[in-house]
Each structure stands twice: as structure tokens, then as C-alpha cells.
Amino acid sequence: MAGFGAAPDFNEGSKINASKNQQDEGKMFIGGLSWDTSKKDLTEYLSRFGEVLDCTIKTDPVTGRSRGFGFVLFKDAVSVDKVLETNEHKLDGKLIDPKRAKALKGKEPPKKVFVGGLSPETTEEQIKQYFGGFGEIENIELPIDTKTNERRGFCFVTYTGEEPVKKLLESRFHQIGTGKCEIKAAQPKEVYRQQQQKQQRGGRGAVTGRGGTRGRGRGQGWNQGYNNYYDQNYGGYGNNGSYGDQDYNSYSGYDYSGYSYGYNPGYTEYSGQQSTYGKARGGGNHQNNYQPY
């Protein structure tokens, strides 16, 4: 067991993301966080209940501010029980609200990944060679810009099973050819559309124009705008939102849509709007009141 104050060695969120859409008894959702609470603060607090393998706090993709919730992965499921057995948790002057993280029922594990920031100099053979090292490839899609007739700065790789995807998602960035690419699980376009509709009802709408200018994509025309690929007819797939982390109405595989804390309006769905959760609470201990938990 990690002692209080110990910090686990991991790429933030990598282990949590690796098991999206799958039930993991060691995983927890942590709501009600102060906007000032850091990943280190949360890790140190929860380490008193058991060894923490991974921890991430979700932030607004535009402002970079904490959205007042996060996820933690314990090594042992018994640590989750210990957390839930404690009646009250207080961190940075706020009562926080830990819950078991439950995967969406009936959602199949992803077999397809989105590869963003792909240099046009990277050949199809290089792509096959790299991704083939993770498992058997069923298909590779290399979208072409219909206006320029040139390859776009992203691609899709579909595997015959879900295990290669889990391995890939353990790291967010991968060196492919001469460039550093970002890997995300691909989602069907209809799923993305539903998420965008919830975002717009929440008052923000879609966040656009960010994906193509992040990291190595900055200033490179071939890498501009691949955040919007879901609006093109490229196999009907999206990538969890506008190429960012604003999509948490179902947290890309965890059933938190309609998760109402009974505190403030604006935190009933994690669809990208700035959370008001953390500014005020309605009080009380709500250990068993939330669905779909």
C-alpha cells in the first residue's frame, strides 16, 4: 500500500483510459472537487485508502480550469470499499463525492482508434508496421482531402479485437514515423452527434479549431482541422468529441449522463459546459441517491 503523500508513477489517465467501456472494480468517479485541487492533492488523499495506480482531474478544454470531477484507479478493489465506508470525505475545504465508476451497459469495447497529428510524410507501410506491433489489423483508413486531393493529418486503424486498442491507449502519444501522434478510441458518428446535442443544450456548443493546432500540429497546414473529421464522410466515425476532453456526458464509456447530484444545475451532465459544481452544495450525505450508479 502506498503511504499518504506517495505519488504513483504513471502518465496521467493512461491506465484509466485503457479500460474505458469496461467494468473495473478498482475505478472510482470523484465529484465535488475544489477547482484548486490538483491531481497530486487527490492522489495523496486517496492513497490513505490503498495504492493508487492512476488519477486524473478533468479540465475544460478551452480554459484549462478544473471541471470539479475526476477519476482514480486503485490497485485493489477493497480500497474502493474503504472509501465508500467512510461517511464523509473533505479535501481542500470541500466535501467531495466519491462513487464507483460503472461502464455503460451493452457498449462494445472499441476496436478502432483515431490517430491524430499524422505527418503526410508517414507512409502507409510505416503505419501498418507500427500499429501491427500491437495486434492484428483489420483495416486502415487514410482520409483524403477532397479539395486538395492530399492526405489529411489523421487516420483510423481497426483491429480484429479490442486488446490492441487497450494497449495503445495506455499512452496518449506515440512516435510514428517522424511525428508524434495522439491516439484516441474512435466512436460512431451517431454517438458523437448525440453528445454534441447535449453539449449545445448545455449552452456551449461544440468546441472547434483546437485539435489541429495542438502539439506538433501548430503551424502545419496538413494538420489543421482534423478535429472536425467527424463532420466528413470518413467511415462515419468521431473521436469522443471535438478532439479534446470536453465530452463527459457519458465520459466516453462511463454512464454518468443524467447523473444529478442534487446540488446545482449545470452539473447534471458532463457535456463540456463549465461546471458549477464546487461553487455550492445542497448539503447532506448522498451516498445512495445517484443513478445510473
From Swiss-Prot:
The gene is hnrnpdl-a. One of its GO terms (cellular component) is cytoplasm. Its main location: nucleus. Gene3D superfamilies: 3.30.70.330. The keyword Transmembrane helix does not apply. One of its GO terms (biological process) is regulation of gene expression. The lineage of its organism: Eukaryota, Metazoa, Chordata, Craniata, Vertebrata. The keyword Isomerase does not apply. This is Heterogeneous nuclear ribonucleoprotein D-like-A. Residues 1-21, 193-224, 274-293 are annotated as: Disordered. Residues 202-222 have a biased composition (Gly residues).
